[in-house]
Amino acid sequence: AGAAEMWVKYLGGKAQEELKGTAVNGDPGVAEAVRQDKFGIGYNNVGFAYDPATGKPIEGLAIVPLDTNGDGTISADENFYGTRDEFTAAVAAGKYPFPPARVLYLVTKGEPNATIADFYRWVLTDGQQYVQPAGYVALTQDRIDEALAALPGSK
């Protein structure tokens, strides 16, 4: 499920089709539609809400915080939206709810062949350098070790 599907589940719905509003194509479309409409609101993946160069919200977008404890205010421990790094650290620490946050997986039909297993190894090792700059939460070393051990050809 994508960002819109997770958002509708957070709001208590079941399917993306329940969302009403202007249809747009993909994450860049959501960001641009909101930027162009002073009353626009959208839900988007982190990599399209924060500027990759500065880590700050993209010009023309405001990141609206969630009152996760339901007390009617954004308390200090809920105010982690200033930069992409602050936000992803809060997600990693479990301060941002699931959904709308979600775990992403790599899957194959059946056991991965040697080429795919090598790709998974790269993702779990050298590829990890690209995770945080792209706006994702890095895996813990324990999760990486567990996944590597499960790959075919691992000792």
Enumerate the predicted regions with their spans.
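Exported/periplasmic ABC-transporter solute-binding proteins
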Residues: 1-155
